[in-house]
Amino acid sequence: MDPAEAVLQEKALKFMCSMPRSLWLGCSSLADSMPSLRCLYNPGTGALTAFQNSSEREDCNNGEPPRKIIPEKNSLRQTYNSCARLCINQETVCLTSTAMKTENCVAKAKLANGTSSMIVPKQRKLSASYEKEKELCVKYFEQWSESDQVEFVEHLISQMCHYQHGHINSYLKPMLQRDFITALPARGLDHIAENILSYLDAKSLCAAELVCKEWYRVTSDGMLWKKLIERMVRTDSLWRGLAERRGWGQYLFKNKPPDENAPPNSFYRALYPKIIQDIETIESNWRCGRHSLQRIHCRSETSKGVYCLQYDDQKIVSGLRDNTIKIWDKSTLECKRILTGHTGSVLCLQYDERVIITGSSDSTVRVWDVNAGEMLNTLIHHCEAVLHLRFNNGMMVTCSKDRSIAVWDMASPTDITLRRVLVGHRAAVNVVDFDDKYIVSASGDRTIKVWNTSTCEFVRTLNGHKRGIACLQYRDRLVVSGSSDNTIRLWDIECGACLRVLEGHEELVRCIRFDNKRIVSGAYDGKIKVWDLMAALDPRAPAGTLCLRTLVEHSGRVFRLQFDEFQIVSSSHDDTILIWDFLNDPAAHAEPPRSPSRTYTYISR
């Protein structure tokens, strides 16, 4: 900045500082003349500086003690001194008490009424000389470069008090607000607006559609409802299951819409509430016990019970007392294959995409090819019946009536080696479960023992059941166990505390499973009970509210069950496998979602 411009800037600053406070607040033309002012304002700057030395104090106050412009701490500026003078750059600014009180009263009234937090000064008639000097100041200002304007405004704002900062903030705030969703497409950045809105949930997305036509266009053109449904399918197993069962999963994760001639987003917009309706129906059916029932009869000349099972979307694999493993088609309920080789009852099994592993009362563990049905390996270690087994991530744990637990390393189906034998139970070990941290075992000796998965060292014992323990499941910190004392107990594995005791079964609790919402148990009384898991973990929940529903269809002891969000599959001593479907008959409830111009086929299976 050259010397001439510096002089002009100094004069303009002196002029601005010499104006009464109320005129500062009315002079908005300076901000209007320089757009860069809108991005400079910082409410954190200080207030006016008063009385730099003692001589200024004497000059300004005629020998009297200085009078404060800024009130004491915690004051609301209720009063000001009758006549206060500030010395700023050797210029005197007179602030009358009348003007200050008027401004303060207007501010209080606005805040009390809740209409606005902006302080509005009392209107006053501006003199002709002021108008002339203001125009001259603006003229000087416009002659400067943008950097000089910025420097001047920064210095000017630093001379103001918080009262003036508040008014400037109220003036600038509307200028700084921008509708970015509307502005981005106008600059060819539609994809950024769509990406921002794609993080909204359904309720917020509905609200966004109603903001204006441009927001509605962005949500429609961006296929945001499709992206929302795809996100839910990726993260939620219930949504994944519905996509498969209802058939609308075929329209997801594809760039091409179901019908290129129809408004594509309308299909997914209509589909979303349909999915929510299905989810609400499922939850209601679980609580009310409404279900459709399918029955597989496994009875044969030698069969006297179905001891174990596991299922997926295509098949059910069952282990029977007649020494066989039967694989059933889940759609047709027909037996597709029978695996033979065990010389005793098949008491436990588990399978993945490659192998089926079974344990038997013949004390052996056998490995089968899941697709071909061929026996790949036979493990002989236990000296009595193998009661339960689990395998995952190259590791398998088996337990036996011989009171021992065997830990195996699985390099391949044909290369399985014994790593460690865990001994500590005083009766048959009925069930095991494990993850990367703990191995958990339960026994007829009434105890649950916890072992370190990596070192196989003993960690702790969970005591509480009054009789032998027949079943358990372990996940995260929670262990749920069932016993021949007819109770179910919930445990915190880290501290060993019993969190809740569930009572309701009349005989031994033989099988139990849980997910994030519910516990499902089966017992020798032939009943299957559904419990509210979240309520069971709440110590304030009354015991009478924990059992949601009791299902009675089996005519014999319930040996094993498995469930997901839609169904329970159970097996019993009555030689049947029951499929309890809580979505009911999908074809009876399916309706095609409609778009404004087309009708789509809503597929059900």
Swiss-Prot record:
Q: Where is the signal peptide?
A: none
Q: Which InterPro entries match?
A: Beta-TrCP_D, F-box-like_dom_sf, F-box_dom, G-protein_beta_WD-40_rep, WD-F-box_domain-protein, WD40/YVTN_repeat-like_dom_sf, WD40_repeat_CS, WD40_repeat_dom_sf
For the region Required for down-regulation of SNAI1, what residue ranges are annotated?
190-228
Q: Which SUPFAM superfamilies match?
A: F-box domain (SSF81383), WD40 repeat-like (SSF50978)
Which GO terms of the molecular function aspect are on file? beta-catenin binding; protein dimerization activity; protein phosphorylated amino acid binding; ubiquitin ligase activator activity; ubiquitin protein ligase activity; ubiquitin-like ligase-substrate adaptor activity; ubiquitin-protein transferase activity
Q: Name one GO biological process term.
A: protein polyubiquitination
The organs and tissues expressing this protein are described as: Expressed in heart, brain, liver, skeletal muscle and, most strongly, in testis.
Q: Which GO terms describe its cellular component?
A: cytoplasm; cytosol; nucleus; SCF ubiquitin ligase complex
WD repeat extents? 301-338, 341-378, 381-418, 424-461, 464-503, 505-541, 553-590
The UniProt comment on domains reads: The N-terminal D domain mediates homodimerization.
**What is known about what this protein does?**
Substrate recognition component of a SCF (SKP1-CUL1-F-box protein) E3 ubiquitin-protein ligase complex which mediates the ubiquitination and subsequent proteasomal degradation of target proteins. Recognizes and binds to phosphorylated target proteins. SCF(BTRC) mediates the ubiquitination of phosphorylated NFKB, ATF4, CDC25A, DLG1, FBXO5, PER1, SMAD3, SMAD4, SNAI1 and probably NFKB2. SCF(BTRC) mediates the ubiquitination of CTNNB1 and participates in Wnt signaling.
Q: What is this protein called?
A: F-box/WD repeat-containing protein 1A
